[in-house]
């Protein structure tokens, strides 16, 4: 069992984009920014514990940081990890519920 303190450090923020919104509507998948060293098992446990939903599968990828310029200086943003968390049939989690 993974300790609860570690679970709180795994999930960083929801990733809000057009692709993430489409994934939520079509395949009941939420997209999250997670800690770079987080495993699929830790992500699954954190989502189930914090949001009280059943997770079917977790897919992860590392997004490479962009090269940015500020004048003549060239820098690079940090890499970060993205997780696609597919919820089981009948489960629902709404991060971006609009004001009505």
Swiss-Prot record:
It comes from Shigella dysenteriae serotype 1 (strain Sd197). This is Large ribosomal subunit protein uL23. InterPro entries: Nucleotide-bd_a/b_plait_sf (IPR012677), Ribosomal_uL23-like (IPR013025), Ribosomal_uL23/eL15/eS24_sf (IPR012678), Ribosomal_uL23_CS (IPR001014). The keyword RNA-binding applies. One of its GO terms (molecular function) is structural constituent of ribosome. The gene is rplW. Part of the 50S ribosomal subunit. Contacts protein L29, and trigger factor when it is bound to the ribosome. It comes from the Bacteria. GO terms for cellular component: ribonucleoprotein complex; ribosome. Keywords: Ribonucleoprotein, Ribosomal protein, RNA-binding, rRNA-binding. HAMAP family: Ribosomal_uL23_B. Belongs to the universal ribosomal protein uL23 family. The keyword rRNA-binding applies. GO terms for biological process: translation. One of the early assembly proteins it binds 23S rRNA. One of the proteins that surrounds the polypeptide exit tunnel on the outside of the ribosome. Forms the main docking site for trigger factor binding to the ribosome.
């Amino acid at each position: 069992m993974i300790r609860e303190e570690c679970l709180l450090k795994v999930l960083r923020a929801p990733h809000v984009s057009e692709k993430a919104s489409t994934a939520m509507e079509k395949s009941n998948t939420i997209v999250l920014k997670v800690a770079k060293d987080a495993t699929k098992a830790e992500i699954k446990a954190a989502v189930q514990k914090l949001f009280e939903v059943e997770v079917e599968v977790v897919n992860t990828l590392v997004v490479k940081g962009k090269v940015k310029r500020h004048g003549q200086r060239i820098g690079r943003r940090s890499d970060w990890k993205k997780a696609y968390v597919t919820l089981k049939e009948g489960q629902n989690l709404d991060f971006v519920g609009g004001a009505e």
